[in-house]
Amino acid sequence: ATCDILSFQSQWVTPNHAGCALHCVIKGYKGGQCKITVCHCRR
């Protein structure tokens, strides 16, 4: 859901990726990024 809500990208900032990364960190992962509309966490 984090990738849908803020799903815009610009040359300087991608808030959807930041939201996804934060979501993953809260869940105990190292971070994450959006791929299309799905947030993928890094282990």
From Swiss-Prot:
GO biological process: defense response to bacterium; innate immune response
Gene3D superfamilies the UniProt entry points to: Knottin, scorpion toxin-like (3.30.30.10)
Keyword Lyase: no
Coiled-coil spans in chain: none
Cystines in this chain: 3-34, 20-39, 24-41
Cellular location(s): Secreted
Highest taxon in the source lineage: Eukaryota
GO cellular component, one term: extracellular region
Chief location category: secreted
Keywords recorded for this protein, A-Z: Antibiotic, Antimicrobial, Defensin, Disulfide bond, Immunity, Innate immunity, Secreted
Role description: Antibacterial peptide. Affects Gram-positive bacteria M.luteus, B.megaterium, A.viridans, S.aureus and S.saprophyticus. Moderate activity against P.acidilactici and B.subtilis QB935. Also affects Gram-negative bacterium, D22 form of E.coli.
Protein family per UniProt: Belongs to the invertebrate defensin family. Type 1 subfamily.
Protein name (record): Defensin
Species this protein is from: Pyrrhocoris apterus (Sap sucking bug)
Top-level taxonomy: Eukaryota, Metazoa, Ecdysozoa, Arthropoda, Hexapoda
